[in-house]
A protein has these predicted regions:
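Intrinsically disordered, low-complexity repeat tracts enriched in Gly/Pro/Ser/Thr and acidic residues
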Residues: 1-156
Length: 156
């Protein structure tokens, strides 16, 4: 299972029908869902009495393997936020409907990081990669499947 698939599973694999007071006004609270996930932040409640994360909030999976802190829209990561995986990798940037979308930085625990544009959680367009211990960044173009990088040359 990929990181994005496990995130979707964690976020959608829950039931919140225990809320009965419906209102479209945003509220702030903390919840522990039946699957053990925790959410702290803003939300609304649908007419069907379902919690919809909406606004600023933090979602932590029960096993602590996924943590998202940022903006939510209609129960999806949407806007600016930070997603941290249990293996130490992270993504800081823009989200749209649970996907990396727009400008963002994906970082690995060894210090490497990839900064560029994303679409559908795939890198596209101009990007820069800085590897751990390399000291010299690479720049290049990504098309969602392959990334072509070269050393970044600085003028003196």
């Amino acid at each position: 299972m990929t990181d994005n698939e496990s995130l979707k599973s964690s976020i959608s694999n829950r039931s919140t029908s225990f809320i009965r007071n419906t209102s479209t006004k945003p509220r702030t609270d903390s919840f522990i869902f039946p699957n053990g996930d925790r959410y702290d932040g803003e939300y609304t409640v649908t007419e069907e009495a379902q919690i919809m994360r909406h606004g600023q909030g933090k979602h932590t999976s029960a096993d602590q393997q996924l943590i998202y802190e940022g903006t939510w829209k209609n129960d999806k990561m949407h806007g600016t936020g930070r997603l941290i995986y249990g293996n130490g990798t992270s993504y800081d940037g823009e989200f749209q409907s649970n996907y990396f979308e727009g400008l963002g930085t994906y970082a690995w625990p060894d210090g490497g990081q990839y900064t560029g544009l994303w679409k559908g959680s795939k890198p596209i367009g101009k990007a820069e990669y800085t590897g751990p211990k390399l000291g010299v960044p690479f720049v290049g173009i990504a098309n969602g499947q392959q990334t072509h990088m070269r050393y970044k040359v600085s003028s003196l």
